[in-house]
Amino acid sequence: LQKELNEDLSIINKKSIVLPLGEVKITKRVNSVLIIFRTNTDIEIWDQNKKRLFEEPKIEYSLRALKSLIKSVNFSKTKYPNINFKTIIVDDKSKEENLNKLKKLIDESSLDISITPLNHEKYKDIIKQQRNDQTFSNLASLLQSFELGKEHGEDLVFFVEDDYLHFEPMMEEMVASYERIASQVNKDIFMCPTD
């Protein structure tokens, strides 16, 4: 291999080498990643009777989540420049002031990121009556996200909400893990990155 132990042994889209497992030929290659990022910058924790950890306005969590996601995508793009990353933000009624903060972060990123508003009307006849508007909005946001993933996803679709922070290598590790595991089992897989 002619590599040091602290260097990457794997080559994206070709082979995955994990020391205890050996080499896996990559047959399930990732050429594009669609990220569906769900936001609601005004609603606090709608389904729980507790406060957020740092008790900041929800927009602060959304901005930090998006910023960490952008850093992770940029990190992945430097390692894997041939992978196409696209992000669609599904926004649920954010105030204009908050949307402008998100747009500023997007404009500074130079990544392929767009914002699409949640279409509540489209799901009124599909989702049964809920106890409150927040539950309906959450379900509608999920449905719209799944539809966007089905319509625009090519290889890998990553669904994420606006209150998760990401380590810089998160996206790269997810792509590499998907390629390795899906190639081992010779099937597309569903992955759930954890906290």
Q: Predicted segments — roles?
A:
Residues 55-66, 133-142, 166, 170:
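Phosphate/oxyanion-binding active-site loops and adjacent basic polyanion-contact surfaces
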Residues 33, 82-87, 113, 155, ...:
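Residue-level recognition of the N-termini of beta-strands and the immediately preceding loop/turn
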Residues 81-94, 117-120:
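Short beta-strand/loop segment that forms part of the nucleotide-sugar
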Residues 72-82, 108, 148-152, 178-186:
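Alpha-helix termini
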Residues 1-71:
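N-proximal low-complexity "stem/linker" segments adjacent to membrane-targeting elements
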Residues 95-154:
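Active-site-proximal specificity loops/subdomain of glycosyltransferases
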Residues 166-194:
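Conserved donor-nucleotide/metal-binding helix-loop-beta segment in metal-dependent transferases, i.e.
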Residues 154-165:
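Short beta-strand-to-loop acidic/aromatic patch adjacent to the donor-nucleotide binding site
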